[in-house]
């Protein structure tokens, strides 16, 4: 029976590693297949992609927090910084791809309300990318702190932890709003297509 448990552990560990690896590779989940049959459906897919973008960026911020609390110069410290650096590149590419997709949607047949949605979604994408940039700049600041051999006292560390807590809460709220917008739009589009099919 023990051999079965060991095999199970190996399988689970491998699956977790694969998921972890996939998440750190550039890939679009909802808009990689191109435009859909209607502009409304295309916008819905873009909203889902933006929501995923927000989640990835929040994960990146969590890495910065881990970096700050990790022992400087350790192997784990270097690995975390490398992950942040990789996420920053992914963030840049996601912004470009989402923006290109939205511009393609805007070039098609789109209502005035739809054009306003595209404009708002482009702004969201730019702001999320800016958060990713800020995360990377924070990580680089931690590296410079290490190189300069600067030490923070207990008071400064508490203030930094408080700021991390507040920003984490803000990102939680941001992603909650993005998810709610996505769900509301999904329900609306589904109902519209159902009514169209009935008539």
Question: Language model features by range: what are they?
Answer:
Residues 1-195:
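Cytosolic, long alpha-helical scaffolding segments
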């Amino acid at each position: 029976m023990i051999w079965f448990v060991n095999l199970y552990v190996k399988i689970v560990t491998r699956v977790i590693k694969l998921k972890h690896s996939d998440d750190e590779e550039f890939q679009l989940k909802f808009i990689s297949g191109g435009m859909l049959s209607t502009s409304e459906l295309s916008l819905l897919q873009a909203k889902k992609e933006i929501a995923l973008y927000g989640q990835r960026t929040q994960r990146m911020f969590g890495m910065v927090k881990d970096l700050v609390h990790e022992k400087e110069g350790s192997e784990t410290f270097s690995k975390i910084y490398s992950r942040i650096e990789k996420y920053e590149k992914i963030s840049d590419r996601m912004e470009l791809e989402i923006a290109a997709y939205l511009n393609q949607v805007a070039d098609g047949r789109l209502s005035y309300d739809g054009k306003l949605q595209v404009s708002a979604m482009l702004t969201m994408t730019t702001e999320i990318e800016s958060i990713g940039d800020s995360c990377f700049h924070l990580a680089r600041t931690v590296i410079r702190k290490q190189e300069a051999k600067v030490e923070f006292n207990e008071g400064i560390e508490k203030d930094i932890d408080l700021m991390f807590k507040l920003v984490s809460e803000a990102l939680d709220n941001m992603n909650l709003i993005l998810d709610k917008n996505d769900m509301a739009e999904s329900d609306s589009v589904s109902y519209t297509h159902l009514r169209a099919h009935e008539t």
